[in-house]
Regions:
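P-loop NTPase catalytic phosphate-binding loop
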Residues: 1-75, 83-87, 94-152, 158, ...
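P-loop NTPase nucleotide-binding/switch module
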Residues: 78
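Tight coil/turn sites that cap or link beta-strands
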Residues: 169-170
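RecA-like P-loop NTPase motor core
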Residues: 190, 194-198
Length: 198
């Protein structure tokens, strides 16, 4: 997911988290280099953990370990359906994936984690072509672009231009794994998000 300042990216992430929390067994870890201010409304939720970048490498490594543990459990007869969903949200992922160890682990998760009910949401204001080349880019099946400054930024996320023409405030283009067709949608802003939290 990408979107410049004023695009509505943070609000859209808040909406996604609110929807995910409707499933009471879902556990969410948020890595936010800005200190979690955009996600403060979730800080007291039992199933939400908000971390800063100093804790990122260890947290991502723990997700890889959990993924491998789930594969081993499944090989011993435990069904994936009995496992809780674990969601890792990384805001401003550009800076983190310059770290080779972090980049390698994100690539492992993006390649293998879905079957074990572990999912990634990667967000950035300005995607970097070098940072997003290779395995991470090819194994992230669904893409969302809110408004960006340049057509080249749109192409990094969507493989085509168009996001540079969006108007901001939740205006977005989305490509889902279930469809090759790009959709133009408008996100919403919930006035009192607390009212929708379980």
């Amino acid at each position: 997911m990408e979107g410049q300042t004023g695009s509505g990216k943070s609000i859209f992430l808040q909406n996604i988290i609110t929807c995910l929390l409707q499933n009471k067994s879902t556990e969410i870890t948020i890595i936010d280099p800005k200190g979690g201010g955009d996600f403060a409304v979730f800080r007291e939720r039992e199933k939400v953990e908000i971390l800063d970048t100093s804790e990122a490498e260890a947290a991502i490594e723990s997700f890889v370990e959990e993924m491998e543990s789930r594969y081993q459990s499944n090989a011993q007869g435990v069904s994936y359906e009995s496992m809780s969903y674990k969601i890792l949200i990384i805001d401003e992922v550009n800076d983190l994936i310059k770290n080779k160890a972090i980049s390698a682990n994100i690539a492992r998760l993006s390649r293998k984690a879905r079957q074990s009910r572990i999912h990634l949401i990667l967000a950035t204001q300005r995607p970097d072509a070098k940072a997003f080349e290779g395995e991470i880019r090819s194994t992230i099946p669904s893409r969302i672009a809110l408004s960006v400054q340049k057509s080249t930024e749109s192409k990094i996320i969507l493989d085509e231009t168009g996001a540079e023409k969006l108007t901001g405030r939740g205006d977005m283009l989305i490509k889902l794994v279930s469809s090759s067709e790009m959709k133009h949608i408008l996100g919403v802003k919930v006035g009192n998000i607390q009212a929708f939290l379980p």
